[in-house]
Amino acid sequence: SGSCEVKTCWVAQPDFRSIGDHLKDKYDSASEMVVEKHKEARGWVETLRPKYPLFKPPTDRDLIYYERSPNFCDPNSETGSFGTKDRVCNLTSHGIDGCDLLCCGRGHNTRTEKRKDKCHCVF
């Protein structure tokens, strides 16, 4: 009688929240780069160099960018953004739906409304 032993190995992804948090940290510390063109034997070559040499140069594991993100606070027909003017925000939230962030620090108007809704309550 023979016995077999089977081993199965797999790599499990971390939960989605930790991946998002990691990417957000990378995004917040991304390095701005400048495109430089120079002539070499094979023709014109574009290379990236850090825009601010006082900061440490990015590693292979850092995020970099060479174009600024559009400003989503203001309307922009090129990007299709309507801006955040007249959006409803959450006064008590410190997240992305919070008034300070969503209104881009421009302040906000507070409106109180009373509504009557049928709730189909059973007592």
From Swiss-Prot:
Q: Name one GO biological process term.
A: cell fate commitment
**What Gene Ontology cellular-component terms does the record carry?**
extracellular space
Give a GO molecular function annotation for the protein. Answer: frizzled binding
Does the record carry Lipoprotein as a key word? yes
Q: Where is the signal peptide?
A: none
**Where does it live in the cell?**
Secreted, Extracellular space, Extracellular matrix; Secreted
> Which sites does the entry annotate for glycosylation?
90
Q: Write down the Pfam families for this protein, in alphabetical order.
A: wnt (PF00110)
Cysteine pairings via disulfide bonds: 89-104
Lipid attachment points (O-palmitoleoyl serine): 1
Keyword annotations:
Developmental protein, Disulfide bond, Extracellular matrix, Glycoprotein, Lipoprotein, Secreted, Wnt signaling pathway
Does the keyword field hold Acetylation?
no
State the InterPro entries in the record. Answer: Wnt, Wnt_C
Write out the similarity annotation: Belongs to the Wnt family.
Explain the purpose of this protein. Answer: Ligand for members of the frizzled family of seven transmembrane receptors. Functions in the canonical Wnt signaling pathway that results in activation of transcription factors of the TCF/LEF family. Required for normal embryonic development.
What is the name listed in the Swiss-Prot or TrEMBL entry for this protein?
Protein Wnt-3
Q: Which organism is it from?
A: Eptatretus stoutii
